Amino acid sequence: MITTIYHSPLGDISLAATARGLAGLWFRGFDCAPSMCADSARFDMNGGGLIDPDPAATAEEIEGCDALSGAHPMCASSPAHGSAIAVLERSWAWLNAYFAGQAPRWVPPMDFGGDNFEHAVCVALLGVPYGEVVTVDDVAASVASRIGGAPDVCAVRDAASRCPVRVIVPVHRVEGLLTPDDPRECVGVALRALEATC
């Protein structure tokens, strides 16, 4: 696992990737960092190489991704981590386009784990158009069309709120998913406002 910090206009975002895809994306200070990052490696974007791990760190990070300065991630010097770095570069490009007010028509590869139901919820969320807001009931109906049956709305709400890849999987477009006092809802409101102005 490789991680990085992306400096967005709304605050720092941590990203975690495997060779298979993006495994986590969360706003630092608002979302919890996944425990899966404990065995991650650090990559120096400026120097272009892996750095020896700091034994005090629980998750090591790539430095240098910055939406505001236009810095560009460098390629991995280690073939073992090259695929994960490529996933982070695609994620970085997606975030740059998004925060520039564009609606990216592609998503980076995903590797967010979970069961089939959680995957169905994430796929349903990916279908919510840029700038639109839906209800949990709408997401549940979309999930039902994919897996059959009528999923419990509470189960859909729980799966959506646990989605490890926020922003790219637009959890913020689901009205009423989080309570107003949940700090993540502040980020969701800001993301919806960004989409409304573009």
Q: Which residue ranges define each predicted feature?
A:
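Low-complexity, small/basic-enriched stretches
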Residues: 1-106, 175-198
